[in-house]
């Protein structure tokens, strides 16, 4: 169910030369954002600054541009690179189930010896475990702003906290590395207890902001 239903007239298809953008972020490599805008509409989202570059005047979270690009013909071009999917949108926002643009880019990158990082708040990422497991280096990076789902629902329209934690467990059990970012908020005090108790050598990392 889409919690933040965007009006059909505010969803548009846009053609782009490439979905691969050379990143200026400290992580380097490439950024991939299959959408402009994000229906999760997080009140604290830093990505709303993107409106300056897209000409959108609508409030963040009330529009969605669906990107279409020329398919990647040589995935090996990105060998040795870090590719971050979802730096200024959530590639697994609810409309991904309809448009499948994130799954499409994962298909096009098959065979690349690249480090893939997925940034998401959605359990829809579980749909693509079959593709994610084919990459040698892949991490799913989650953010959790609270363990109180009533508070969470007031802050964003993403998956519930329970759904996120269950999805994190499934991603981990599938052998995929994951990170969990948390905001500095008293209601997050027990996040380390809630996450699976695993040895220090585990592929789960929790960090605070």
Each PLM stretch: what is its role?
Residues 1-141, 145-151, 161:
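Conserved Radical SAM active-site core
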Residues 110, 172-173, 203:
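Anion (oxyanion) recognition and catalysis
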